[in-house]
Amino acid sequence: MIIGIGTDLANIERIERTLERFGDRFRHRVFTEREQRKADSRQQTAATYAKRWAAKEACSKALGTGLRMGISWRDMAVQNLETGQPTMYVTGWAAERLKQLTPEGHEAVIHVSLTDDHPWAQAYVVISAIPLEAAARSA
């Protein structure tokens, strides 16, 4: 069952200007160390940061809060599986909110899709809840 959907569109050039203006202050406030390493190792650094920015915005919308109720940027982290598929990990208040949304006897799964086409980066997040029995069978 779907328990949350969020989408966001970010301007890559705006993120690039923000990186130039605020540098590490911006990076450290919004992105985890792992996200920073990933983006800084890419040729299209600003596009990588913009996609992750959009993913965090989309996730906060899927959680039904936006960036309120104590949820901070670094409570949501985009990571990639070995296949390259993006995933979202939540901690802190974002994890608490996810727990509140997840029905008893279910496990939450966060699905993430990222894309960019200069000057835009887009993210789409769907949070679903699957019964624990189904989760155990698919593991």
Curated annotation (Swiss-Prot):
Keywords: Cytoplasm, Fatty acid biosynthesis, Fatty acid metabolism, Lipid biosynthesis, Lipid metabolism, Magnesium, Metal-binding, Transferase. It catalyses: apo-[ACP] + CoA = holo-[ACP] + adenosine 3',5'-bisphosphate + H(+). GO terms for cellular component: cytoplasm. Pfam families: ACPS. Transfers the 4'-phosphopantetheine moiety from coenzyme A to a Ser of acyl-carrier-protein. Belongs to the P-Pant transferase superfamily. AcpS family. This is Holo-[acyl-carrier-protein] synthase.
